[in-house]
Amino acid sequence: MATALCNKAFAAAPVARPASRRSAVVVRASGSDVSRRAALAGFAGAAALVSSSPANAAYGDSANVFGKVTNKSGFVPYAGDGFALLLPAKWNPSKENDFPGVILRYEDNFDAVNNLVVIAQDTDKKAIADFGSQDKFLESVSYLLGKQAYSGETQSEGGFAPNRVSAASLLDVSTTTDKKGKTYYKYELLVRSADGDEGGRHQLIGATVGSDNKLYIIKIQIGDKRWFKGAKKEAMGAFDSFTVV
C-alpha cells in the first residue's frame, strides 16, 4: 500500500511505513462554550505562556528591542478564524502562498526553509475519518510534499528508485482526539532529494474538519540539519498545539 501511495502521490520512491507508532498525544481544548480567542487564551495559560505585546506576538521576542524579553517559553499564542496554535516566537509572518487555501504562513528568521502553513478548504465532510484511511488522505494531499520536476533517466543509487531524484519516508503516523472528541490525522515524513540539500526536510502534517465545514491542514517543514540543532522543539511545539474548533 505504501508503494502505491508514493507512486500515485508525488512520483518519488516508496514511502516506508514506520515499524511502530508512537502513543497518541491528546490535544486538549476547553470544554466550555467560549469564543475562539478566549479559548486560545485559556490554552495559552495552560501552557504557562506570558502574554506579549502586539509587536511581540507578530514577530517574536526578536522584535522587542526596547525592553527586556518577557516571553521565555519560546512560543507566542495565535488565534485564527476557526483554529489556534502556538507559534515559534522568533518566526516571522510571510505573504507567500505555497498552496491553495493558505490562511497563515510563518517562517524561521534564520532560514526560510523552515516554515509553517495553515490551510483551510471547504468540504462536505463532517469528520476527518470521512476522507477514508490515513493512507488515502495522505495520498489526496500529496501536493503538500512537492512534485519531482526532473524528467530523465537515472540509476538506482543513493536510496532512490530508477529515474527518481526524490524520495519520502513516512516516519510516523497517528491519530489524536481532543477533549471534544474531534479526531486529527497526523504524519511525520522525511523528504530527500538527490542534491542532498540539508540532508532532507522533515514534514509534519496534521488535519481535521472544523465545525464550520472546513478542512484544516497544518504543515510544518524543517531542514534536517536544523531539526537536530534545536528546530525540532519549535516544530513539535507548534504542531502539537494546533487546535480546531
UniProtKB/Swiss-Prot annotation:
One of its GO terms (cellular component) is extrinsic component of membrane. It is found in: Plastid, Chloroplast thylakoid membrane. One of its GO terms (molecular function) is calcium ion binding. Pfam families: PsbP. The keyword Nuclease does not apply. GO terms for biological process: photosynthesis. The keyword Transit peptide applies. Keywords: Chloroplast, Membrane, Photosynthesis, Photosystem II, Plastid, Thylakoid, Transit peptide. SUPFAM superfamilies: Mog1p/PsbP-like. Residues 1-57 form a transit peptide. Its main location: plastid. It comes from the Eukaryota. Gene3D superfamilies: Mog1/PsbP, alpha/beta/alpha sandwich. OEE2 is not necessary for the accumulation of the core PSII particle or for the accumulation of either OEE1 or OEE3. Belongs to the PsbP family. May be involved in the regulation of photosystem II. Required for high levels of photosynthesis oxygen evolution. PANTHER family: OXYGEN-EVOLVING ENHANCER PROTEIN 2-1, CHLOROPLASTIC (PTHR31407:SF6), PTHR31407. This is Oxygen-evolving enhancer protein 2, chloroplastic.
